[in-house]
Amino acid sequence: MSGLIGKKIGMTSIFDENGKNIPCTVIEAGPCVVTQVRTNEVDGYEALQLGFDDKNEKHSTKAALGHFKKAGTVAKKKVVEFQDFATEQKLGDLIDVSIFEEGEFVDVQGVSKGKGFQGVVKRHGFGGVGQATHGQHNRLRAPGSVGASSYPSRVFKGMRMAGRMGGDNVKVQNLRVLKVVAEKNLLVVKGCIPGHKNSYVIIQK
């Protein structure tokens, strides 16, 4: 499985050869530096650790600076491991957006936008308790009953209630690559991906 670390630029739309308007997301994908090579002999599994987006050295620990120095690179803001990388890579190698091709499908993982504390209507899509008139008072967006009284005399685990919404790790699978702009390290994928603008995402194929 190959992949890159990227940054969400934003959404736009393009026209295909049939004149159909397709919504798409632009991602700044790489270039990423190989900061560590995991091997079965030393680590018990095989993986590549990639670093993305330069970081100011004064915001890094000495241990982190020493780790990146071994790879011959500056400190990075985002570091991710990719297991079973498709191609053989060495420490310090640069991997760019050219590993992707137009027309293939990728998975994109990111942290969804945080919405704060939300009620059950927005968070879970509840319909409320019915009509807004005929004696109904202040219950339109209420969750309703969460369980019986004498038995089971408790609330079941997983009961959908109000709470903090968003800020979760979300993966969107099988997004088609519409365009690869190698000279600008841009990847254009069909549809939307999780996260706000300039948030980090992981692109896998």
From Swiss-Prot:
MF terms (GO), sorted A to Z: rRNA binding; structural constituent of ribosome
Keyword RNA-binding: yes
Pfam family membership, one: Ribosomal_L3
Keyword Coiled coil: no
InterPro entries (alphabetical): Ribosomal_uL3, Ribosomal_uL3_bac/org-type, Ribosomal_uL3_CS, Transl_B-barrel_sf
GO terms for cellular component: ribonucleoprotein complex; ribosome
Keywords attached to this entry: Ribonucleoprotein, Ribosomal protein, RNA-binding, rRNA-binding
BP GO terms, sorted: translation
Subunit structure: Part of the 50S ribosomal subunit. Forms a cluster with proteins L14 and L19.
Function statement: One of the primary rRNA binding proteins, it binds directly near the 3'-end of the 23S rRNA, where it nucleates assembly of the 50S subunit.
Similarity section: Belongs to the universal ribosomal protein uL3 family.
Protein's recorded name: Large ribosomal subunit protein uL3
Organism of derivation: Flavobacterium johnsoniae (strain ATCC 17061 / DSM 2064 / JCM 8514 / BCRC 14874 / CCUG 350202 / NBRC 14942 / NCIMB 11054 / UW101)
